[in-house]
Amino acid sequence: MSEKHYAIVLDTGKCLNCKACTVACKFENNVPVGDEAYRLWVTEMPLQGRFPHLHQEYQPSQCQHCRNAPCQAVCPTRATYTTSDGMVLVDYNKCILCKACMLACPYDARFVSLQHGAVEKCTMCIHRVREGREPACVETCPTKVRVFGDLNDPSSQASRLLASREWFRLKEDRNTKPRLYYLR
């Protein structure tokens, strides 16, 4: 059997900006509440249409878990690494807080964690995934914006969505090859 290739597929048209994903992430990963440090966030996109027919969309985002991760390439201590199934992680014990990875990340998805004394980012809830569970942001979303799955499994919901819908990845011109896919 081939290795797993985890990814998250996002249907942003379903996002209500309820922040359940952000709260679940902070709680699951012990990120201090109220702190400006976020492993994921939701951006309000510009209003579309004309009054009275206006439409608001939101774009959830987080670390893109890139196949060609610039943060990993610049890390002098190799604290940033990629697991065999595609998750880009940080070994807090190796991080020297040089912040080179923060500067290299085109998605602005890293922050300094005083709790860990290291740069921190989304882990795609690897601890949950290893237990056979979904990341907290995926599980908690009331409108099911995020779908987590193994793209090497053609029967996974994530694979089926990508096969049946048009999609894009953020900042594709940077050649980072993100593992987050946004449905059109």
Model-derived features with residue positions:
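Non-ligating segments of multi-cofactor redox enzymes
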Residues: M1-R184
